[in-house]
């Protein structure tokens, strides 16, 4: 049935009679009904991809593309004088994730479904997400990010589980979202657990709330502030609630297919996405021993055969360690299992650094994952090598066979087919549409690397995308973009290791250059996007600096003809879908050795931006694929950085005192900025750079500045620049999440 006929049947109206909100609700229901007709993937073994976050983005467009009806719907609406892009704007973006971890999980479940693999996502149904970012007085403020409406993609189910805590139990309710594969007759689910007693009225000013009222707050927020005891306890409540539900679901579904639990590993594989779901290991063991009479040794060996751990970071702060007393306060029944697992390891191996419970009585989640899984993977070649040779070296020596690399990927359906419609249409005309299911087919573009005609068309498409971004930012943020400028973009959660502060120093130097009469050949627009965790003070200070610089520069008539700076408010997937296709320079400038992979680098590459980056994360593989002539690499390499950490060999003042650096850093506390901002914040950031600079901003600053200047010069040589653009798009196929998931499936889940 066509959509027009569907609407006529449901409402007795024509498409032209409905407003955009009404059209959205009708389209939502139409797509949900189409999805309902799909059979579930049903292989004997099922993958459970457990993740604290899924940054799924808006689903209407994604589902229309995967159903193969996007163009058809667009034409039907156009015939009724309606625009699908305007209908899409009605949808609220689900607040189920924050950064790269959640976006990766979303690309992965898309690929799992598109490849016809039997595999579901499992997480929590957060009502307010991380937070909605609002700027006021050049500072970030946090508000609840409500997104659940009466009409949404969530499907209610009758599935309920009892989750036991020390002093009470909670009954969960399961909501599902259909995960449609690209042009597939089958589907999977994203399983999101919730409680019916959630109460958003307990939220006070901003996003503060009573962290002790678990029955009302449990699924309110993603990553609630854990800077105090109650916050840490709430995180444990959340994580256990997620994994207990997951474990019960896994066992129920396996039993329904004939498992006797002794053979559970033949029916299920659990992929632990970072350390947040780690308690699924002891919880599965607990359920097997308590409910099914399986001996402890057999139970942990079953779990070991059906569990894999993906490590996403080498930052010690992100490898979770929970005080044993906190776990005893929340889930004492699980502590019994954890202590037994710790005893198993102590009976086999010496060495404090590999134990599950350390001498300070902290439970190391990553250590437990590594011991009691059969796979440990990093997410880019360099990251995995650092894990094996440095951060997890002791474990690699124990279990070399467990360690493997699975370089991250992105779904081209969302990050090209939807977000860059002009480029996708041209690629199909030029090389066909096979790349949507076999991304390596993008290499056919290499035949056109010297084509002036193709280069001219790509330039035209980039300009079209800049105009789309211009209209979007004017409507949503009041930003006036100059579409003739070079667009230089850094979009990531705010963290010192990602070094937004180094980019801010570049902006200061460029500002001072312009004030001194050194003018760029073409205007540059620098975009930042991302949120800082409310408890992460220095990250908030970096945001404050950028907002002050933005106010200063954009209102200075001497400078704003040549330079604009914007921090996009409440950056999310929807903003990324507009910003990435319009970008010329992709900022991937983390301190070498600190970024596990990154996926923004892949999205920019696919959409025709050139990378300015360190040899970190997946930048290393981009460099190898495109060749050094098609990427802009700068900075110290990971081996040297790791040695500097080992020897405490980096002293920021040595770099601060160099010509051209001192003036730039000192500008942070200049009168020009202080009068626009908060003196305490600016001085704190200044002192951090001067006296600590843990992530070595100043070590790479001069090289970074010089390399960006080289990029700006190369941009003026349009033939050279566009040749590099074609080479980057052509080589982006390796970074398809379909490739990543095929490797997971063949080398881990069904090994």
Where are these regions (language model features)?
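A conserved ligand/cofactor-binding region detector
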Residues: 1-751
């Amino acid at each position: 049935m066509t959509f027009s006929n569907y609407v006529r049947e449901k409402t007795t109206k024509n498409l032209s009679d409905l407003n955009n909100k009404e059209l959205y609700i009708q389209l939502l229901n139409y797509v949900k009904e189409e999805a309902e007709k799909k059979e579930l993937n049903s292989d004997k073994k099922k993958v459970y991809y457990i993740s604290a976050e899924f940054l799924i983005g808006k689903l209407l467009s994604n589902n229309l593309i995967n159903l193969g009806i996007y163009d058809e719907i667009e034409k039907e609406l156009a015939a009724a004088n309606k625009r699908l892009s305007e209908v899409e704007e009605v949808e609220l973006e689900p607040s189920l994730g924050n950064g790269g971890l959640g976006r990766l999980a979303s690309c992965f479940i898309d690929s799992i479904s598109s490849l016809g693999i039997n595999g579901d996502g499992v997480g929590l149904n957060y009502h307010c997400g991380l937070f909605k970012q609002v700027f006021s007085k050049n500072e970030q403020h946090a508000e609840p990010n409500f997104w659940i409406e009466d009409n949404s993609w969530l499907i209610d189910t009758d599935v309920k589980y009892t989750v036991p805590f020390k002093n009470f139990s909670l009954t969960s309710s399961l909501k599902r979202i259909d995960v449609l594969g690209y042009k597939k007759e089958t589907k999977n689910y994203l399983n999101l657990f919730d409680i019916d007693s959630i109460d958003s009225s307990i939220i006070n000013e901003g996003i503060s709330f009573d962290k002790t009222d678990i029955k009302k707050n449990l699924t309110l927020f993603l990553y609630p502030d854990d800077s105090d005891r109650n916050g840490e306890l709430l995180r444990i409540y959340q994580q256990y609630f997620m994994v207990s539900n997951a474990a019960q679901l896994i066992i129920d579904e396996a039993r329904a297919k004939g498992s006797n639990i002794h053979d559970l590993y033949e029916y299920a594989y659990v992929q632990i996405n970072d350390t947040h779901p780690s308690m699924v290991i002891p919880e599965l063991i607990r359920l097997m021993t308590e409910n099914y009479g399986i001996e402890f040794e057999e139970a942990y060996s079953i779990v070991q055969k059906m569990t894999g751990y993906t490590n996403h970071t080498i930052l010690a702060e992100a490898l979770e360690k929970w005080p044993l007393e906190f776990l005893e306060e929340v889930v004492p029944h699980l502590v019994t299992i954890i202590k037994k697992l710790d005893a198993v390891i102590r009976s086999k191996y010496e060495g404090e650094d590999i134990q599950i419970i350390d001498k300070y009585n902290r439970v190391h989640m990553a250590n437990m994952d590594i011991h009691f899984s059969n796979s440990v993977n990093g997410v880019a070649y360099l990251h995995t090598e650092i894990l094996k040779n440095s951060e997890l070296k002791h474990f690699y020596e124990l279990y070399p066979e467990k360690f493997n690399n699975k370089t991250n990927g992105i779904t081209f359906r969302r990050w090209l087919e939807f977000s860059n419609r002009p480029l996708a249409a041209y690629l199909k005309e030029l090389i066909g549409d096979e790349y949507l299911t076999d991304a390596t087919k993008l290499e056919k573009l290499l035949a056109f690397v010297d084509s002036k005609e193709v280069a001219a068309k790509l330039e035209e498409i980039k300009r079209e995308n800049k105009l789309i971004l211009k209209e979007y930012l004017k409507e949503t943020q009041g930003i006036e973009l100059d579409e003739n400028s070079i667009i230089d973009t850094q979009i990531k959660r705010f963290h010192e290791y990602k070094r937004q502060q180094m980019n801010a120093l570049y902006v200061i130097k460029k500002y001072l250059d312009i004030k001194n009469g050194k003018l760029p050949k073409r205007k540059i627009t620098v975009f930042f996007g991302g949120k800082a965790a409310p408890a992460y003070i220095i990250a908030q200070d970096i945001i404050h600096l950028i907002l002050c610089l933005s106010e200063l520069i954009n209102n200075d008539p001497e400078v704003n003809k040549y330079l604009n700076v914007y921090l996009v408010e409440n950056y999310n997937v929807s903003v990324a879908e507009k910003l990435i296709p319009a970008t010329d320079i992709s900022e991937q400038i983390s301190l070498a050795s600190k970024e596990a992979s990154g996926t923004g680098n892949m999205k920019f590459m696919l959409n025709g931006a050139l990378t300015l980056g360190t040899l970190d994360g997946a930048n290393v593989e981009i460099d190898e694929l495109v060749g050094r002539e098609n990427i802009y690499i700068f900075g110290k390499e990971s081996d040297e950085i790791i040695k500097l950490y080992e020897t405490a060999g980096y002293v920021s003042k040595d770099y601060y005192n160099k010509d051209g650096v001192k003036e730039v850093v000192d500008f942070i506390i200049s009168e020009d900025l202080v009068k626009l901002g908060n003196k305490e914040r600016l001085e704190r950031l200044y002192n951090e750079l001067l006296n600590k600079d843990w992530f070595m901003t100043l070590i790479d600053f001069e090289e970074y500045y010089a390399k960006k200047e080289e990029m700006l010069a190369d941009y003026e040589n349009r033939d050279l620049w566009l040749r590099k653009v074609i080479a980057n798009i052509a080589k982006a196929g390796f970074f398809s999440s379909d490739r990543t998931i095929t490797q997971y499936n063949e080398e881990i889940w069904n090994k």
